[in-house]
A protein has these predicted regions:
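Short glycine-rich, low-complexity segments
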Residues: 1-163
Length: 163
């Protein structure tokens, strides 16, 4: 797992390591839902799979992505449907995501994760350190991204976002 792992020169040279890691996270999360370092992607995946504590109830590896080029943290935006058909709810933002799926061509569906007690104003989040991580929950707000646009992924410790 990770950048360059298992690659043979000339084979799969275009494989994106961010894409590869996120694909591994999706596989691990799907295994849990249907049934080194203290903090790393590998550790978070192992925790999620119960390799360190079986039956731990964890279901998500939260991730922060960094844009290629400027290497700045990526902030996603979205909104729930409003109360009536054809209406849009309040715009929300997050630097922290749950990976829902990754396609063969490295597009991913990401769900915004937020602490429901954290203010939802999009302007107050200037970088990931401004975002509360104490009680992250799934929002149901998903975005689609091209993983070739990212150069780095930070995995936070595995958590449970589903009851």
């Amino acid at each position: 797992m990770g950048c360059g792992h298992g690659r043979v020169e000339g084979v799969s040279a275009k494989e994106n390591c961010v894409c590869e890691i996120l694909r591994d996270i999706v596989d691990a999360q799907n295994d849990v839902i249907e049934n080194c370092c203290d903090t790393s992607c590998e550790q978070s995946i192992n925790d999620l799979l119960g390799e360190t504590d079986p039956g731990n109830g964890l279901d998500t590896v939260p991730v922060i992505l960094y844009c290629a080029g400027d290497c700045k943290p990526f902030k996603g935006f979205g909104a729930r449907r409003g109360n009536g058909l054809g209406t849009i709810g309040k715009l929300q933002s997050s630097f922290i995501f749950r990976v829902k799926s990754v396609t063969d061509d490295c597009c991913a569906v990401l769900e915004l994760l937020r602490d429901p007690n954290d203010p939802c104003e999009c302007d107050h989040l200037k970088d990931p350190c401004d975002q509360s991580t104490h009680n992250l929950e799934n929002t149901g707000i998903c975005i689609t991204v091209d993983l070739d646009c990212f150069c780095h992924v930070t995995c936070l410790p595995a958590i449970s976002v589903f009851d």
